[in-house]
């Protein structure tokens, strides 16, 4: 009897043991697959880091190598900066310093990006906006410097060009299926758990407002030796770190901008041997705005690009106050970096403080992801 009971128990227990073994094997297989996926992701991210570092190095080398060649060439062509008579007196010695150095920055960015464009197709829209706005800046510089028309492109001409490029970029954002109309709200939990602002069709005017506002902000920031270059290096570095972490597929071009600006800064730092001109500043404004939109982060521009925002707001406040009060000035001079100069700050101090503020804001923004 006991033998029969033991046999029965063994017969019942055998399937359970087999089932336990089966589920155990499935569990181990699931864990192994998950681990394999994690390893693949780590390898991909490691590869992306290496490719981005290489992009920085290539762009830096191109930019640093071109500057000693292009700067004397700009000198010979007499492509010199025209300095305002009503500006800080310390700026009068800058008269004739070669400008249109943005051509160096753009060349380094474009050449570097071409190495990655097949593997990273998402850099194409950013490259389009950056180069497009750079062309507008080049035409503006060319008219002012070569054709000796101090006004450059008139506001309507410049606005038409910016509207066309921004319109094409907006169409891509809304129809490509890769970006959409959502914007990540800072400090709400990051890309996975955060809140997104969906504007629907209001997204269209929002893109125009943010892109053109950012572009003008970067343009106004380019008023001191190394200022726009230093601030934008930090902003581009922020986007590069986020792009790698989120695998957004744009890190090669953000890295290329970092590298090209580092190479350019060697010759743009005080006392500057070359200025980027509107060719560079408008291109960089387009880069900052388009990169932010490609990662659904345009709201973050108000944090990492606060200096740009303050610069453009200072001009708006100055002009409005001047008109309302019949000629009185709110600031000693606008954009605001000139106000600090007239308050007694040295040019290098303004650049250092603005750069430190930007670095801190980039860290704060990263904490908000």
Question: How should each PLM-predicted stretch be described?
Answer:
Residues 3-4:
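Cysteine-centered motifs
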Residues 13, 21-27, 47:
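Residue-identity detector for glycine
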Residues 24, 31, 35-38:
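Short hydrophobic alpha-helical segments enriched in small aliphatic residues
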Residues 44-75, 105-135, 169-175, 181-183, ...:
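Alpha-helical transmembrane segments
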Residues 84-97, 148-162, 336-338, 342:
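Juxtamembrane helix-capping/reentrant segments at transmembrane boundaries
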Residues 122-154, 158-162:
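Hydrophobic alpha-helical hairpins/lids featuring a short glycine-rich hinge
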Residues 146, 178-194:
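Membrane-interface helix termini and inter-helical loops of multi-pass transporters
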